[in-house]
Amino acid sequence: MKPKVFITRQIPENGIKMIEKFYEIELWKDPKAPPRGVLLEKVREVDALVTLVTDKVDKELLENAPKLKIIAQYAVGYDNIDIEEATKRGIYVTNTPGVLTDATADLAFALLLAVARRIVEADAFVRSGEWKKSEVGWHPLMFLGYGLKGKTLGIVGFGRIGQALAKRAKGFGMKIIYYSRTRKPEAEEEIGAEYVDFETLLKESDFISLHVPLTKETYHMIGEKELKLMKPNAILINTSRGAVVDTNALIKALKEGWIAGAGLDVFEEEPYYNEELFKLKNVVLAPHIGSATHEAREGMAELVAKNLIAFAKGEIPPNLVNKDVLTSSPP
């Protein structure tokens, strides 16, 4: 008899086809996340769970899952999962690193360009008919933005995605500085990046892009103090986690001109609505689509499947997050 898995959202079919060879699948087909009560009910009878970042896997849920042995997260980040509690209960937790690196780096750079060159603002100007009404065909001062060549890009968090972004920026002639918990000498040499402390990065960067996980240490690491250290022409990009930035402080900074603009793909609460933020023209917003390419999402589905299949075969999943679990619950 196959073990049971509950998948909390429709993932690409390539992953489903791989998983169904080893598991009995129950799939939540509604695009909205399953209600809390439904999720608590479903986990009671399953051996495996496939989750998204919007699924809260806390102590309460784990207490309701006596048979649960593995949680396969369909994402790189896993701040929605109580890793410590899962490990205590001998539950494996896996993620999907690597396959979404290029997609997320592409989006970060797209946001950077969109804000710097005021692309969304210009698009709205044309579509709304305002350009026609203005009777100004072309003007030397129309929609002036910022060029990239020779500018400094500060990258906070220099893992796979941060390094991929740096390589793209190099092609635009940008100078790269970075701050990370640990220095990356090999990457510094390969890419031509310079390690600096956090305060120096904030003060010297023309563009700042965030690529850190959400932890107690990174929560609101960009707040009023940090925003005031940045250049008045600086642009902030966030494709990591929304709570890394204090939203209220950012709104104040954008309104009062402490910084020039921002590009956000993530928010403190998702789905997100803030009328005050939405009125600002110097911010470009996206609905958490960092990995939203066919290639990345299919690659993530394949990794989820590989992690589940390895576990079903009595092997260590290739992307095991909580390796301490092997001490109490070896495969």
From Swiss-Prot:
GO molecular function, one term: NAD binding
pH dependence per the UniProt record: Optimum pH is 6.5.
Location of the active site: R241, E270, H288
Annotated localization: Cytoplasm
Reaction it catalyzes: glycolate + NAD(+) = glyoxylate + NADH + H(+)
UniProt cross-references to HAMAP family, sorted A to Z: GyaR (MF_00776)
PANTHER family (alphabetical): 2-HYDROXYACID DEHYDROGENASE-RELATED, GLYOXYLATE_HYDROXYPYRUVATE REDUCTASE B
Subunit-structure text: Homodimer.
Family listed: Belongs to the D-isomer specific 2-hydroxyacid dehydrogenase family. GyaR subfamily.
Record-given protein name: Glyoxylate reductase
Gene encoding the protein: gyaR
